[in-house]
């Protein structure tokens, strides 16, 4: 038996919004430690890793490890039926082929439940090695979203250059070039507005804009985003989900095309 | 839906001017059928509602001198029909449009020729410039100058295009109007169908092409599953797989292109080298492409085996030594070509071979039709096959292929090229290992 209850459906809604653009289907691996999801996008350029800790749920019970393959579009549809303040409960029997998602209004006057068919997804799980990143940038998630959106107008690729001076996002295309530099903030009143750079060595990497923009769909989940970079290693874009876990996106860099 | 049903269901708004031409197009009926149905409907309605009918009058203008005057077509109100019929010689009339008489109406087209009706005209000559009048946009003929409601006409157009209507409302003014819009060529079988479908086809063809170029998806699958792809060949034995990456990448030492070349030369047989070399050396090919095919004859063989290469090299030396005439002087006219290689003279032969190999590879692709052999005197003869178009085409190709190949290389890199940097999208699988 699996049962997980969240106080606010809005969190689950946001999570779904954050991944459904990249993934059509995914397997939620439930265990007593929580729920985990790992999946690559169709083109195998990016990887989404979602971790929801069991202690972040209002109620969490997972008797046996359970993998629930879901169509994320369908799940998003169901979640749209919930009010933001509703309690949401996910339930599934062991070896069941359906999951029940139940919404309860705050005053318990309205209870709605939706049953969704589960899928058998043959998805590869990748081992993600521990990496000492050369640069870790923490910045406002909104700012990052804005930058990605703006630069996407100039080019399909964004060059992220991180030095001790700061982090620079650049794009150049037919329109022209765009450079956005963010310096490390000295002292900020609000923690969420801070730009913090931890740098071992400078890094310059090129990434596809469209993926970055897909990642920024997770912006509502967190005020801050963390970009971890290292030469010839995928970028890690991490959004923390307060008290619940995190969502990490891995994006393969664009590499030098030696053969041209 | 049949016209009768549409009429019975009041689907046709007679507050607006209902044109028979529209009905013809929409319901794909013959004029007679439409006319009959419409007349019957009007008859039924007539006592209750009054209709204003317009008729198309066709006849010949009465001229004073000669008996046979000019053809005349006119759309006239029912009330004036008799006058017109009297006025015009050989007059005939047909119902053209109907609307409810009186009241306020939104303006409607009182005249609209058929958009896609194939008609055969008995005695009408094509205007010579008529075809030119049809402006086409994306292969779809634009409207013919008669103003019509865009939405409505579009709907009709698309419907009409789906099935070719072959109605022949004999000798009506529609014909002449329509005919003027038709391109002269397409009278018989040039149905609107073909015009309509072709852009769709084009679009559908263009779309995958664009997708191929733009989406990383296509690149990635190409890299993973199609080793024949130009990019995926030698320097990255399995660029798509993680393991390789981790074995090779972390050491960080990205080998220089020359090193790679050497490696691949050692490891891979010549044909495998072919494609990358093509890309790496646009400049040498340009040098050799125009007239210097003779050099590449040697190179071609030299690429095949080192022994042969040596032999040929010697032979080449010999030939060059025997004759210092420059090849440039009569490259195009002479059937026989003597070997001279300007690069050879500048560079030690063995160094040159590398470049030559590259050149040969490309040349091999370009001019497979040429026959080459050693003649009795020891000259290498390049005999161009009579098909001249081929070499001509292929000579153009190096210019064209160079940018084209760059664009093709990886679909993502093509666009990255725009950004000034030559990058291609790596797959995430290359960085993580499967559990």
Curated annotation (Swiss-Prot), chain A:
Protein keywords: Chromosome, Cytoplasm, DNA replication, DNA-binding, Nucleus
One Gene Ontology term, aspect cellular component: nucleus
Pfam families associated with the record: PCNA_C (PF02747), PCNA_N (PF00705)
Record's keyword annotation contains Nucleus: yes
Effect of inactivating the gene: Mutant flies show temperature-sensitive lethality, hypersensitivity to DNA-damaging agents such as ionizing radiation and methyl methanesulfonate, suppression of position-effect variegation and female sterility.
Segments of the chain annotated as binding DNA: 61-80
Annotated tissue distribution: Expressed at high levels in adult ovary.
InterPro entries reported for this sequence: DNA_clamp_sf, Pr_cel_nuc_antig, Pr_cel_nuc_antig_C, Pr_cel_nuc_antig_CS, Pr_cel_nuc_antig_N
Molecular function, one GO term: DNA polymerase processivity factor activity
Family: Belongs to the PCNA family.
Protein name from the UniProt record: Proliferating cell nuclear antigen
Annotated organism of origin: Drosophila melanogaster (Fruit fly)
Gene: PCNA
């Amino acid at each position: 038996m699996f049962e997980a209850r969240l106080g606010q459906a809005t969190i689950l809604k946001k999570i779904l919004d954050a991944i459904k653009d990249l993934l059509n289907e995914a397997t939620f691996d439930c265990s007593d430690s929580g729920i985990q999801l790992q999946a690559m996008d169709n083109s195998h350029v990016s990887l989404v890793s979602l971790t929801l800790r069991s202690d972040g749920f209002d109620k969490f019970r997972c008797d046996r490890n359970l993998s629930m393959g879901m169509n994320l579009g369908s799940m998003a549809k169901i979640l749209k039926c919930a009010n933001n303040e509703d309690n949401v409960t996910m339930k599934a029997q062991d070896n069941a082929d359906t999951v029940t998602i139940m919404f309860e209004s705050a005053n318990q006057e309205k209870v709605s439940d939706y049953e969704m068919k589960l899928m058998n997804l043959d998805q590869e799980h990748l081992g993600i090695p521990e990496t000492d990143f050369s640069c870790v940038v923490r910045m406002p998630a909104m700012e990052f979203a804005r930058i990605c959106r703006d630069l996407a107008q100039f080019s399909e690729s964004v060059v992220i250059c991180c030095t001790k001076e700061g982090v620079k996002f650049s794009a150049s295309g037919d329109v022209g070039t765009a450079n956005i530099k963010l310096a490390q903030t000295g002292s900020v009143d609000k923690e969420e507005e801070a730009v913090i750079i931890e740098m071992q060595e400078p890094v310059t990497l090129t990434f596809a804009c469209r993926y970055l923009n897909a990642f920024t769909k997770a912006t509502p989940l967190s005020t801050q985003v963390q970009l971890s970079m290292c030469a010839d290693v995928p970028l890690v874009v991490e959004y923390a989900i307060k008290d619940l876990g995190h969502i990490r996106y891995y994006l393969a860099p664009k590499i030098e095309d030696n053969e041209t | 839906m049949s016209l009768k049903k549409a009429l019975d269901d009041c689907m046709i708004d007679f507050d607006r001017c209902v044109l028979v031409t529209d009905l013809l197009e929409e319901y794909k009926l013959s004029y007679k059928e439409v006319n009959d149905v419409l007349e019957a409907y009007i008859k039924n309605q007539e006592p209750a509602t009054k209709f204003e009918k317009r008729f198309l009058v066709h006849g010949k203008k009465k001229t004073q001198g000669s008996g046979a005057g000019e053809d005349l077509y006119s759309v006239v109100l029912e009330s004036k029909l008799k006058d017109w019929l009297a006025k015009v010689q050989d007059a005939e009339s047909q119902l053209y449009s109907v609307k409810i008489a009186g009241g306020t109406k939104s303006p409607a087209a009182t005249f609209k020729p058929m958009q896609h009706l194939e008609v055969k005209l008995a005695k009408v000559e094509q205007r010579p410039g008529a075809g030119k009048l049809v402006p086409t946009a994306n292969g779809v003929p634009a409207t013919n100058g008669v103003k019509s409601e865009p939405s409505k006409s579009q709907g009709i157009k698309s419907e009409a295009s789906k099935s070719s209507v072959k109605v022949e409302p004999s000798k009506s003014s529609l014909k002449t109007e329509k005919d003027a819009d038709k391109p002269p060529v397409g009278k018989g079988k040039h149905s609107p169908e073909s015009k309509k479908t072709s852009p769709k086809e084009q679009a559908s063809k263009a779309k995958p092409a664009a997708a191929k170029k733009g989406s990383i998806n296509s690149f990635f699958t190409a890299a993973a599953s199609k080793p024949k792809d130009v990019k995926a060949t030698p320097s990255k034995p399995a660029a798509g797989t993680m393991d390789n990456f981790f074995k090779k990448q972390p050491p960080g030492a990205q080998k220089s292109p020359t090193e790679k070349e050497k490696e691949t030369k050692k490891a891979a047989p010549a044909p495998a080298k072919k494609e990358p070399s093509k890309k790496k050396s646009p400049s040498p090919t340009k040098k050799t492409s125009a007239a210097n095919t003779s050099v590449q004859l040697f190179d071609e063989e030299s690429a095949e085996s080192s022994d042969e290469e040596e032999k040929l090299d010697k032979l080449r030396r010999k030939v060059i030594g025997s004759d210092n005439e420059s090849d440039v002087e009569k490259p195009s006219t002479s059937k026989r070509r003597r070997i001279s290689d300007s690069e050879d003279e500048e560079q030690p032969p063995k160094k040159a071979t590398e470049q030559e190999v590259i050149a040969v590879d490309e040349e091999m692709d370009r001019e497979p039709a040429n026959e080459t052999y050693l003649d009795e005197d020891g000259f290498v003869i390049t005999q161009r096959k009579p098909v001249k178009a081929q070499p001509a085409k292929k000579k153009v190709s190096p210019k064209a292929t160079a940018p084209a190949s760059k664009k093709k290389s990886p679909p993502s890199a093509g666009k990255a090229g725009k950004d000034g940097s030559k990058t291609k999208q790596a797959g995430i699988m290359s960085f993580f290992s499967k559990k």
